[in-house]
Amino acid sequence: MKQGIHPEYRKVVFMDSTTEFKFITGSTRYSNETITMEDGNEYPLIRVDVSSDSHPFYTGRQKFASADGRIERFNKKYQR
């Protein structure tokens, strides 16, 4: 690999803005904000709008669109 062309890979904290859930992971994202976590270390902070803690698919609060109405309308329209 060429030296000096790759971004720095380091541990950062992603924080869900909705639920304020925080998790540490590796990333090359840059941030001016920092946060001190429970382990006593200071990490760059990256705020996200949606994470697995607030997304309806992962929380089980997802609403499924019912296709029954469309099927019933189709069958009624083309019923012989």
From Swiss-Prot:
<dbReference type="InterPro" id="IPR034704">
    <property type="entry name" value="Ribosomal_bL28/bL31-like_sf"/>
</dbReference>
<comment type="subunit">
    <text>Part of the 50S ribosomal subunit.</text>
</comment>
<dbReference type="GO" id="GO:0006412">
    <property type="term" value="P:translation"/>
</dbReference>
<dbReference type="InterPro" id="IPR002150">
    <property type="entry name" value="Ribosomal_bL31"/>
</dbReference>
<comment type="similarity">
    <text>Belongs to the bacterial ribosomal protein bL31 family. Type B subfamily.</text>
</comment>
<dbReference type="InterPro" id="IPR027493">
    <property type="entry name" value="Ribosomal_bL31_B"/>
</dbReference>
<dbReference type="GO" id="GO:0005840">
    <property type="term" value="C:ribosome"/>
</dbReference>
<dbReference type="Pfam" id="PF01197">
    <property type="entry name" value="Ribosomal_L31"/>
</dbReference>
<dbReference type="InterPro" id="IPR042105">
    <property type="entry name" value="Ribosomal_bL31_sf"/>
</dbReference>
<keyword id="KW-0689">Ribosomal protein</keyword>
<keyword id="KW-0687">Ribonucleoprotein</keyword>
<dbReference type="GO" id="GO:0003735">
    <property type="term" value="F:structural constituent of ribosome"/>
</dbReference>
<dbReference type="GO" id="GO:1990904">
    <property type="term" value="C:ribonucleoprotein complex"/>
</dbReference>
<protein>
    <recommendedName>
        <fullName>Large ribosomal subunit protein bL31B</fullName>
    </recommendedName>
</protein>
